[in-house]
Design a protein with these regions (language model features):
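Short glycine/threonine-rich loop-to-helix capping motif typified by GTGT followed
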Residues: 54-62, 250-255, 287-310, 337-339, ...
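Electropositive phosphate-/nucleotide-binding environments in soluble metabolic enzymes
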Residues: 20-27, 57-61, 89, 142-149, ...
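Active-site-proximal alpha-helical scaffold in enzymes
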Residues: 82-113, 146-179, 219-225, 336-357
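Conserved catalytic cysteine-centered active-site region
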Residues: 54-106, 114-147, 185-211, 244-246, ...
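Buried hydrophobic positions in well-ordered alpha/beta secondary-structure cores of metabolic enzymes
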Residues: 7, 33, 44-47, 88, ...
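Beta-strand segments within the central parallel beta-sheet cores of soluble alpha/beta enzyme folds
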Residues: 6, 41-51, 77-83, 107-112, ...
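Condensing-enzyme catalytic core mediating Claisen C-C bond formation in acyl metabolism
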Residues: 1-23, 135, 167-168, 199-264, ...
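Conserved active-site "lid/cap" helical segment
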Residues: 1-86, 155-162, 184-190, 203, ...
Length: 390
């Protein structure tokens, strides 16, 4: 397998973007990624698009074709990737594999999603189907917050995690999201704000839940030979990728205090990259709900099982702590345009590893120059863990 590097990144403004079409939104990310990489559309041989809501949340049913043509990517081979909320990471892996296997020299992973063109109740119904539709949604009416409320209650019962612990995750992520110019939610909040917010699915409250978001992110990758040819100043190398899947039916899961797919994907990523959790300088984890971030700490080995709440309680996941997590605000504050999130995580990893965080107060200190992105699809139905190294 050939070495592959990230050479260019771009990210649109996240939020309610009814001012643009899906193609225009994608272009907001693609254009700066070209400029960052020092290439043009004609140089890209392969495009993998992560997008979930085609024909449901937004109007286009063939978004890879439509967005690529709008962005001038007329010579590239196209594919759309779907892995629920991990679709962006699936697209990144697919673009990486195209280069690593010798099928392309330059490829793009593009995430583009519009979730706010339809009303909230319809959107929530579609998201609620992100499991086993017949057994869980159709029969029991589980919404997506209700799925993660099951995990939150189980984690509390087994490990003593509290609602205040969950609130601390939200407070941290809003703190850093307020510093991020592309973030959807820029308001700083307190633990009391979280605890006083409306109950969505007990114990999860409004401020425990990520927003529904429109947004796009673009990642340009290149082979080692192309990196040398282009004389890229600061390539960020793909050190390892691990991936795994979980059972469709939640009743077949071993427990509700973590995601087995996250454990397996992280183990495979560490092995592929030849690093240990202690060598990770910072991480982006899938905090669709506050409990998801705490479980992620444990699942990917940042702490022992049952100690995730302690990690955030002690401030260890903030800048200056043991392992900074979600310094862009995470899904909770930056936003969660489902098919885009994985690529947006890679955008943040790349910016941090190049020491280019737009707001310097959220630039993480780097020792090993290694960052990790953990991206979950569904309730652990898919998981990708990507490790980048400068």
């Amino acid at each position: 397998m050939r070495k592959v590097a990230v050479i260019g990144v771009g990210n649109s403004k996240f939020g309610i973007r009814n001012d643009v079409t899906i193609s225009e939104l994608a272009f907001e990310a693609v254009k700066p990624s070209f400029e960052d990489a020092g290439i043009g559309a004609k140089d890209v041989e392969f495009v993998a698009l992560g997008s979930v809501g085609a024909g449901a949340w937004y109007e286009e049913l063939l978004p890879a074709v439509v967005t690529s043509e709008y962005c001038g990517l007329t010579k590239a081979v196209l594919v759309r990737c779907e892995a629920a909320c991990a679709s962006g990471s699936a697209a990144f892996f697919t673009a990486y594999a195209a280069i690593a296997s010798g099928h392309a020299e330059v490829a793009m992973a593009l995430g583009a999603e519009k979730m706010r063109e339809i009303d909230s109740s319809t959107s929530m119904e579609w998201i609620g189907r992100a499991g086993y539709y017949f057994w869980e949604f159709h029969n029991f009416g589980l919404t997506f917050p209700a799925y993660y409320a099951l995990y939150a209650n189980a984690h509390m019962a087994k490990y003593g995690t509290t609602e205040e612990d969950l609130a601390l995750v939200s407070v941290k992520n809003h703190k850093y999201g307020a510093m991020n110019p592309i973030a959807q939610l820029k308001n700083r909040i307190t633990v009391d704000d979280v605890l006083a917010s409306m109950v969505i699915a007990s114990p999860l409250k409004l401020y425990d839940c990520c927003p529904m978001t429109d947004g796009a992110a673009s990642i340009v990758l290149a082979s080692e030979e192309k990196v040398k040819e282009l004389k890229v100043d600061t390539p960020v190398w793909v050190a390892g990728i691990g991936y795994s899947s979980g059972t469709a039916n939640l009743s077949k899961r071993p427990d509700f205090v973590g995601l087995e797919a996250s454990v397996l994907a992280s183990q495979r990523a560490y092995k592929a990259a030849g690093v240990t959790p202690n060598q990770i300088d910072f991480a982006e984890v899938h905090d669709c709900f506050t409990i998801a971030e705490i479980m992620a700490y444990e699942d990917i080995g940042l702490c022992a099982k049952g100690e995730g709440a302690k990690l955030v309680r002690e401030g260890q996941t903030e800048i200056g702590g043991k392992i900074p997590v979600n310094m862009d605000g995470g899904l909770k504050s930056k936003g969660h345009p489902i098919g885009t999130t994985g690529c947006s995580m890679i955008y943040e990893l790349t910016k941090q590893l190049r020491e280019e965080a737009v707001e310097k107060s959220r630039q993480v200190p780097l020792k090993n120059y290694v960052g990790l992105a953990h991206n979950v699809g569904g309730t652990g139905h898919y998981c990708y863990v990507t490790i980048l190294k400068r």
